[in-house]
């Protein structure tokens, strides 16, 4: 039994050197991916993008009125794509909101939620952006909206 365990460890260490990364995260997105993982951990979720094989890119999206996408294609990493034009002009909170929204689709398998509170504000980061609710993602509302993101 002991020799079998040694063979397993030896075999896995050899394979580790040959592994090609299954995911890539654009350096511009890395901070926001890290924040998502930190916020998940605060809420007892473990998010490991390499294990989950999630990639992230900032690219030009040519579809009208689309600023972010989550692509699930069999055999390839799940991919978050953020529109470069939007990204270049967005504030830190707008970037975070969008990345968290797309990771909500890609990691948490969340659908859009377009419900509003009594004041007409969207109650979720997972709003489609085309609903009647108002996106109100500010330092004051951030924590509650992130709580909702992970409480599904």
Task: Please tell me what each predicted stretch does.
Residues 9-13:
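C-terminal motif of bacterial Sec signal peptides marking the signal peptidase cleavage site
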């Amino acid at each position: 039994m002991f020799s079998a365990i040694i063979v397993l460890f030896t075999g896995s260490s050899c394979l580790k050197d040959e592994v090609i990364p299954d995911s890539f995260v654009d350096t511009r997105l890395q901070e926001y991916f890290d924040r998502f993982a930190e916020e998940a951990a605060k809420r007892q979720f473990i998010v490991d993008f390499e294990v989950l094989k999630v990639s992230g890119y900032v690219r030009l999206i040519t579809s009208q009125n689309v600023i972010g996408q989550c692509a699930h294609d069999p055999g390839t990493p799940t991919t978050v794509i953020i529109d470069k034009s939007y990204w270049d002009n967005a504030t830190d909170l707008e970037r975070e909101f969008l990345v968290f929204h797309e990771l909500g689709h890609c990691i948490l398998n969340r659908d859009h939620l377009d419900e509003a509170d009594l004041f007409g504000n969207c109650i979720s980061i997972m709003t489609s952006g085309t609903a009647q609710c108002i996106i109100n993602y500010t330092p004051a509302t951030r924590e509650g909206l992130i709580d909702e993101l992970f409480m599904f």
